[in-house]
Amino acid sequence: YTSIKPLGDRVAEAEEKTAGGLLLTETTKEKPSIGTVIAVGPGSLDEEGKITP
């Protein structure tokens, strides 16, 4: 409804759609928690100055 205007603090969130018109659900908006490691460093130094992986 494009003719409806919110009053005061009664604001409705707009539906998020892709360019093709698909509605995005909350689960598709989450950032991925799985990735691929492509490089690693030598490690970090501990209090004694030794490198720990």
From Swiss-Prot:
Compartment(s) where it occurs, according to its Swiss-Prot or TrEMBL record: Plastid, Chloroplast
Keyword Plastid: yes
Superkingdom of this protein's organism: Eukaryota
GO biological processes: chaperone cofactor-dependent protein refolding
Chief site of localization: plastid
Xref: CDD domains: cpn10 (cd00320)
InterPro entries listed in its UniProt record: Chaperonin_GroES, Chaperonin_GroES_sf, GroES-like_sf
Region (Cpn-10 domain 2): 11-53
Region (Cpn-10 domain 1): 1-10
One Pfam family matching this protein: Cpn10
Record key words, sorted: Chaperone, Chloroplast, Plastid, Repeat
A single cellular component GO annotation: mitochondrion
GO molecular function: ATP binding; metal ion binding; protein folding chaperone; protein-folding chaperone binding; unfolded protein binding
Function: Seems to function only as a co-chaperone, along with cpn60, and in certain cases is essential for the discharge of biologically active proteins from cpn60.
Oligomeric form and interacting partners: Forms stable complexes with cpn60 in the presence of ATP. Homotetramer.
Family listed: Belongs to the GroES chaperonin family.
The protein's name: 20 kDa chaperonin
